[in-house]
Amino acid sequence: MKLEEAINIIKEEYPKYDLISVVDYDNYFVFSIVPPNYTIEQYGEWFGGLVAVNKLFKLTMHFIPLQHNPAAYAKAVENNTKYF
């Protein structure tokens, strides 16, 4: 699966949310998304959950790094993050 396809899947599942970043990690593209028109200045820090697209099954899921390999995910965040 290519990133563009994962972006389309996320936009279809969460059409009103804005994409902030994506991490290419293992079998997932892990997205950070926020509600529309969200600004830190107006609402403060956003602590919403991460949403991932499984590259193999092309399905979305809530992603919790601690349920995977936290050290490997942290390394992926350092090296494989793209911001929108």
Feature map (PLM): residue ranges:
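Amphipathic, interaction-prone secondary-structure segments
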Residues: 19-46
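Extended interaction regions within the primary functional domain
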Residues: 34-36, 48, 63, 77
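Intrinsically disordered, low-complexity segments enriched in small/polar residues
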Residues: 12-15, 23-26, 71, 81
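Charged low-complexity stretches with an acidic bias
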Residues: 57-84
